[in-house]
Amino acid sequence: MAATTSFSSSLSLITKPNNSSYTNQPLPLFPKPFLKPPHLSLLPSPLSSPPPSLIHGVSSYFSSPSPSEDNSHTPFDYHNDEDDEKPREECGVVGIYGDPEASRLCYLALHALQHRGQEGAGIVTVSPEKVLQTITGVGLVSEVFNESKLDQLPGEFAIGHVRYSTAGASMLKNVQPFVAGYRFGSIGVAHNGNLVNYKTLRAMLEENGSIFNTSSDTEVVLHLIAISKARPFFMRIIDACEKLQGAYSMVFVTEDKLVAVRDPYGFRPLVMGRRSNGAVVFASETCALDLIEATYEREVYPGEVLVVDKDGVKSQCLMPKFEPKQCIFEHIYFSLPNSIVFGRSVYESRHVFGEILATESPVECDVVIAVPDSGVVAALGYAAKSGVPFQQGLIRSHYVGRTFIEPSQKIRDFGVKLKLSPVRGVLEGKRVVVVDDSIVRGTTSSKIVRLLREAGAKEVHMRIASPPIVASCYYGVDTPSSEELISNRLSVEEINEFIGSDSLAFLSFDTLKKHLGKDSKSFCYACFTGDYPVKPTEVKVKRGGGDFIDDGLVGSFENIEAGWVR
């Protein structure tokens, strides 16, 4: 368990293929200056660079539309009202070592993680000739890859990424994995999380001559590795990560190694598994392991670096151990119900949250329904505890897709009706309890209430399977500015009046922590309390047009000096 495992800051544990282990000698410490990069070839552009295969062994293929294609209908042109109601997932990462079908397995695993990002997808493999080969593209995994593209990605190890932008604009150049050539060879990286000191690091690197090709915070990591003087290779990664603040679960690939890293607080999940042929697999969730028939072994521990090569799996402490602060919203909303996250079943957590709601906030009703899909398991728990039947009162159109995790906000009026259709026979004349996972701005909840009343519901009682969200997240989750969060501005009674329900109740924060028991101190609750484990140096602010800024490069920010005030 991540919450109970500690590491020595000076020792390295090596796991051999036969599962025996021994301890390495203590590793030397290295200075960490910001050096001027001599000759870097980071993230070569397909338009301006020499043939990628000639740059430090990096081969790059970008699946972007040709100039002649009609690009007017991209995935980013569509958005609806449900977007305002959900904290949007960050990203998903996959790493595979030791399987001749690495690219195809990576492709399948990314399918399993598609719910974590729909803007773009990419895979990097290492060919038999030790060349890093990349295919990235905008859109869903199935839109970016096909059989012919996977044929261009041979090799026995690979990393993959599905993207939702929390830092950096939505464009092809920001789609990961990123690949860079530097003086010691080539490296690819896929990152889930968000770096709160990104702007500071980027400014320091640019002042010393670094040239950036993207607006993503992940590129900072590659520059830090490139300028590091530490040896051997994994120490360069440790050297770079010790300068980072915030959330990061990352997988790296080089010509002969696969590396997995998780930040010392363990904000975002990262798990390790193994296939029957011995191939090692890393993924953001266990659902990805299940799909490719890899057996779950354990989490990558907070603050751990795992290096996989021909000699086995080596574990190294990243930096002194902190008390883990794992994102509680992985259990409330982000992860799939069939995943095991932070050592707990997501399904069981959500079911218990629903049971708690039924116990703490009962109401006379005839039927329990869910806002699909994320509210279903909690609604089942509520129904089971209350003894009231669960029925499918809202039907979700899955053909629309999870468009709320796409940042464009051009279509807002038809979102709820486009995605959710009421079942009049379930609702008409009934007192209805509606279970949802969260309320962010409140706009979608009000429209759902109105939709149910129009379908004949006699009463509508909203039950929310999480505490009120009162503060923005800076650790890899796209949330609005605090001034746009309805629970930060209004009381529960005022929110109930705003959305038009007959009653409204949230999961109690104290009861949530009580349910987590001895592990309660291992979770991050910043979105519920405003108490940040790693203080953000910039605060999200509402843009004049009504949009919020969550990009670490574009837009204006207000500095905060003396802690967080909500």
From Swiss-Prot:
Cross-referenced PROSITE patterns: GATASE_TYPE_2, PUR_PYR_PR_TRANSFER
Polar residues: bias regions: 15-25
Region (Disordered): 1-28, 58-87
Stretches with biased composition (Low complexity): 1-13, 59-68
Signal peptide (UniProt feature, chain positions): none
Ranges of Basic and acidic residues composition bias in the record: 70-87
Entry's EC annotation: 2.4.2.14
Residues at the catalytic site: 91 (nucleophile)
Binding positions ([4Fe-4S] cluster): 327, 473, 524, 527
Database matches in InterPro entries: GATase_2_dom, Ntn_hydrolases_N, PRibTrfase_dom, PRTase-like, PurF, PurF_N
Any one Pfam family match given in the protein's UniProt record, by short name: Pribosyltran
Catalytic reaction equation(s): 5-phospho-beta-D-ribosylamine + L-glutamate + diphosphate = 5-phospho-alpha-D-ribose 1-diphosphate + L-glutamine + H2O
Family: In the C-terminal section; belongs to the purine/pyrimidine phosphoribosyltransferase family.
Protein name per its UniProtKB record: Amidophosphoribosyltransferase 1, chloroplastic
Organism: Arabidopsis thaliana (Mouse-ear cress)
Gene: ASE1
